Every structure is written in C-alpha cells, then in structure tokens.
Amino acid sequence: MADLRATYRLQLGAGLDFAAARALVPYLRDLGVSHLYLSPSFQARADSTHGYDVTDPGRISEELGGEEGFRELASAGLGVILDIVPNHMAADGENRCWADPALRTRFFDVDPVTGRHRRFFDIDQLAGVRQEDPEVFAETHRLALRLVRDGLVDGLRIDHPDGLADPAAYLRRLRSDGVERVWVEKILDPGEPLRDWPVEGTVGYEFLNDAAALFVDPAGEDVLTRVCPPSPPFPAIAWQAKLEQVRGTFAPEVQRLRRLSDAPDLERALSSLPVYRTYIPPAEDADRDALAGNPVRDLLLSGEAPKEFVTRFQQTTPAVMAKGVEDTAFYRYNRLLALNEVGGDPSRFGISVERFHGGCLERARRFPRGLLITQTHDTKRSGDVRARIGALAGMADEWAEYVRRWRSLVPDGAPPSWNEAYLILQTLVGAWPLELQRLEAYAEKALREAKVNTNWVEPDAQYERGVRDWCRGLYANRAFVDDLEVLAERVARAGECSALGQTLLKLTAPGVPDVYQGDELWALSLVDPDNRRPVDWD
C-alpha cells in the first residue's frame, strides 16, 4: 500500500479513460501526488457522464477501458483511491438487478404498497440500494473488495453514506472485510463533529468552508448586508426552502412515513433539522441537540417509534437538506457567494484564527488522514472564484459603490430580478474573464435552482430568455465592461493572495491535501457542468 501524501481527483469519462489517466501519471508524480482519486469506475449507464449511475457494481466500465485498463493504470506508479456508490444504482433496463422483478425487490428499497422506490434525492432514475441486507452488500461489493485485496486499490471514497439505513454498520462491515482506508462524503454542519466511525475522515468540505471563511474580512459584513438586495435572514430562507421541498419534491417520501407512524407535524420535523441527519439508535448527545424543539424528538428518542419509521426519517432528512439548502437557499441568499458552499453557513461571516486552529487540532487528534479540499466536482464554484468573491469583503465600500452604479442596469419589473442580477454580478467579478455562453448556462442553472421565477420542473422559457438577453446586453455595454474590468483586476489580485493562502493551508494543515483536476493552476470554474469541462493537460 502506497504511503499517503496527496491525492489528485480525476473525473473519468469519454474524454479521460484509464489509458489517458495513465499518461498523466509521470506529471502527477512530479507534482508530488501519491494517489489518483478516481471518480466511480464501475459499469454505468451507456450515456453516463459521471459514473454515479452504476448498472453493474461487479464489472469495471468497458467505456473507460475495462479491468485490463484499470489494472494497467493501478500499476503505473501511483496508488488508487476509488469512489464507490453504495447508496444507489441506476433504475434502468441495463441494470439486471433492476430489470428482474425478483432481484429488484431484493436489492432495492421498494415500497410494497405503492411500488415506488427510495430515490437518490429527487432523481427517479437512481434507486436506493438495501445495503443493510448482508447478501446485497456482498453482491454489490464483491469487485470493490477484490480490488482492495489484490492491492490495486488503496482506499475507498464512500458516496452519500447518509442515504444508507445504518452508515456506521456499513462502515464497520467494510473495515471487517479488509478495507483499511475509507473516506466518507459526509457533509457536516459548521461545528458538527464527525461520528466515531472506522474511517480516515471526510472528503474535506469542513476544511474548505473554514479556510474560505478565514480569508473573509468580518469588517465588511455590515456594508455587504446593506448593499445586497433586501432578504430575510439565511436561516429563515433555508427553512422555507426545505419546507417547500418536503411538501413538493419529497411528498411521496412523506406519505410513506405517514403510513408508518402518526408522528406530529411531520413536514416541520423534516424541515427543522439543523444537520443532515441523526444516527439513532443509539442516540448520542449530538442527536439530542439536533432534535431540540423538533416535533418528533420524543418519538425518535423514546425507542417506541417503529424501527422502519426511524430509519426512513433519517434517510429522508439528508435529501431535504441537500435540495432545500444546497440547491435552493444557496441561490436565494446572495450576500456573499463565497460563503454559499456545500456544508457551509452563509450567515457565518468569517471565522477567527483561533477557531480555524481549533478545527485543525481536532482533525489532527481524531482524523489526521482526512482529506483537505478547496474544490470538488460538487462545489458551487472553484477555489479561485470563491477566493475572489470572498475578497469583496475586504473592499466592501468600493464594491458598494460599483453596485450602486450597476443597479441602474437592472430595470424593475423585467428579468432578472435585482436579487438574481446581484448573484450574476458577483459571479462575473469572481470569474472574469468569462465567456458569455458560460455565463448564460450558469445563470439558467442558478435561477432554476432558486425556484423563484423559473425551475427545473416547469421552466419559464420567456423569463429565461429575458435573463439571457440581459446578460448579452451587459456584454455589449462597453461602459459596463470597462467598469467591470477595472474592479475585476483589483479583485483578482486580492483573490490570488487569498487563494494562495488557502492552498498553503491545504498543503500544511493536518490532513491529506486533495487537488481537483486542473486546480494546480488558476481555475475559474463555476458549478457543474462548468467545473467538469475537459482539462488542457498540455
């Protein structure tokens, strides 16, 4: 097993298969990387662009090069950490476990009353897997465990463990089956400790948010609060967004829970949890704190609730948090976009040096091999864009003057709204120079995620056309572009200092630094799919 020094995340796909990844090994070794950190590599849907829609966890992707190509990559001189997806598989005819009715009810979490399956978040095409069944675990992990035993894989990254019925039991099973190194994609609320699981640590979002907040000047908070569009406090926005998701997107999950128990005020209970999930039984102090004031607190902690209700409640809250906060509230509350990141709290405007060091000390004590990141395939923007936008807090008065000038460019009553425009303007400053086509794609996704004037289910084509026209008008406005370029240059200089500082911390703080593909150089990327564009390795 190779010594763990630094990992490098590769998003495999049509433009980057095992052979292409192998060609990068000499470059990455010279960079100081010890391990390739590969996106899911098992057989996925034929048109998959990411690998998380696995159809056969017992076979390595033929499109990426098959097992022979994987073995050649693993023997090229760097260790391998493999991202696996135990929570769900593709609900697709290509998946024999889904296509066979008998296997479907055995492998997947299917409601016997309605025939509906537990979904990954709101994606009907991804069905929840019953990893709590030992036979299902054995069948779906046979290949992954063999790759570890054969020395081809040094460790596993576990996607969305919070979707599993019992994450702790699952992780103990992995450890007992010989997997020594495991990292979990566990999203922690600021200040929430990782449970005492048999893992190396998380994939690093808590470090990302602390490092970003450390470089946000708290002196700019009042000015940025006054200059941004009027808005309720972030906790109120987040709660409302979660409640909307519970009543809409996750109505089928709520109905299933109601059949299991007459729990009081279930919608509010699902919307009020301040963390992604609890882990009952056994109930720890962290669970009791998270459930304080929750309508179902006594029911969950008493041990009297049906076991299936407790399990499904805990499997549902992570989806509510992810879709309500990450994918809705983060696009509605736009005071400083640098703080709107997975696992972050936009109402926390900067942190002290003492608090940052406290987090480092805790990591060194409990999980010294946890990953340290500044960007992933799931972040809302690259570390460099985040650093630039965060630098606005240190020049808040100057930013406010620009905002007051640009406010006249956003006519009332026409798309975009001032709040939407404020998001777009921050993005321009953070990612400039930015091609118009990329901005249009980002604006469309951001507005659909916000779900205020358009959305994914029923897009308002006319409204979105108006936003595109407004963006094009900005680029055609020479006076605006000249103004933007003056500010963007100043922000870029401050952002570079911040980004380099955060990178230095990533390379020296307790933990294992991870570099997202292409991020060893300046990378001005936005949310996916923008951050999954091909890297120019030349």
Predicted features along the sequence, with ranges:
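Conserved short loop/turn motifs at secondary-structure junctions
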Residues: 157-164, 425, 429
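Extended, charge-enriched "interface" segments that sit outside catalytic cores
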Residues: 290-297, 303-306, 370, 385-492, ...
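N- or domain-start disorder-to-order transition segments that initiate the globular core
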Residues: 129-133
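Conserved phosphate/anionic-ligand binding catalytic regions in large, soluble enzymes, centered on
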Residues: 270-278, 325, 369-385, 424-434, ...
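Acidic/aromatic-lined carbohydrate-recognition and catalytic surfaces
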Residues: 1-121, 150, 160-224
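Polyanionic (Asp/Glu-rich) segments that form extended negatively charged tracts
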Residues: 167, 180, 211-236, 241-262, ...
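Metal-dependent catalytic core segments for phosphate chemistry
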Residues: 119-122, 198-199, 203, 209, ...
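Structured alpha-helical segments in the cores of large, soluble enzyme domains
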Residues: 136-149
